[in-house]
Amino acid sequence: HLCDRRQRQMCIRDRYKNTFLFYLPRLCEHCLNPACVASCPSGSIYKREEDGIVLVDQNKCKGWRMCMSGCPYKKVYYNWTTGKAEKCIFCYPRVESGLPTVCAETCVGRIRYMGVMLYDADKIKDLASTLDEGDLYEAQRQIFLDPNDPDVEAAALEAGISHDWIEAAKASPIYKMISKWKIALPLHPEFRTLPMVWYVPPLSPIAQAVDVGKLSMKGFIPDVQSLRVPMQYLANLLAGGNVKPVVEALSRLLAERTILRKYSDNAGTSQFLTCEILPEQLQGIEEINELKALGLTVQDVCDMHRLLAIADYKERFVVPSANRNTEAAVLMQGSQGYNLGGGEDMRRRADSLFGGPMNRKIIPLFEEYQRAPDSTQGGK
């Protein structure tokens, strides 16, 4: 039996690269403890208090490029034309208007979600100081607050968080996947930057091996622990090497899919596809004890299927608009705007590394732009 198990593991491992495609969209994590902010000598990188987005102040950036080496995810880039650092801005103008990011909205697989998470900022230092890398996932999950808790809601209002943002946190799909169902995991938590972009681990090739009858069943749920090679691979990627949270997340996903597949045949395919199966129809199922062991209820199974399979636009993206009533944004209309590729405005403001005038040429974006006068030659 042990020999057969090892042969099965070797077979799945050898065929892993040929039978399983795992596309991992790696973008800026907009961390709670961003290393790029700490490594910038000029202090040009900052994390916004109102929404947690990490941005680069182009007027302060001096091109030291220490943020590039400081970011463990390598998501800060250097613009050789402007001499400035650039990174993902999380589409903050769209987020301020209550819209999702472009990458999330244009995802054809509809696998990206956006929402509000409330957290205790006073615990960040203790969390980042956790000794065991395997405990970092659970430690970061504990920093998130329950928006439905009256004490948390009162503290949020006292801290200046608007009522709209609190209501958005209650309806956040991110909170459900991270804190309620525990099916989302952070990317490389051992970096200790506390990333805020989390990932739901893939079911393949685990589920594929189950479908063809290569794995044993543990109750009604396939025994995912028999595949230690994929488990450890995903654990090193998403849980700091701790296999337990990965096994639990995949077990919950497999339980949801197994139950919905089994009982959708009785309810009809149309009801399964539109999630019209009511929790009352699943109350007497024989798998109720296994669900309790996984920390799930029948309502959780229906909600998971709704959110992960057929959720609409408003369910996947719960983004409240920013409250900027005190700013006169209308005064900026008609200006040049976000210009980092050259242009007359950029050439007149271009500085060298140490604050003096930059004498090198910057190719303009349009031919009709006139060349900026050279101050060293007394041009006007």
Question: Which residue stretches match the model-derived regions?
Answer:
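Long, compositionally biased charged/polar accessory segments in the mid-to-C-terminal portions
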Residues: 109-375
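Active-site-proximal loop/turn and secondary-structure-junction residues that shape catalytic pockets
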Residues: 44, 77, 118
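Cysteine-centered iron-sulfur cluster-binding motifs in ferredoxin-type domains/subunits
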Residues: 7, 22-43, 50-74, 83-106, ...
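A structured beta-alpha segment of the ubiquitous adenosine-cofactor-binding alpha/beta core
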Residues: 13-21, 25
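Single conserved hydrophobic/aromatic residue that forms the stacking wall/gate
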Residues: 1-12
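Short acidic DE-rich linear segments
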Residues: 377-380
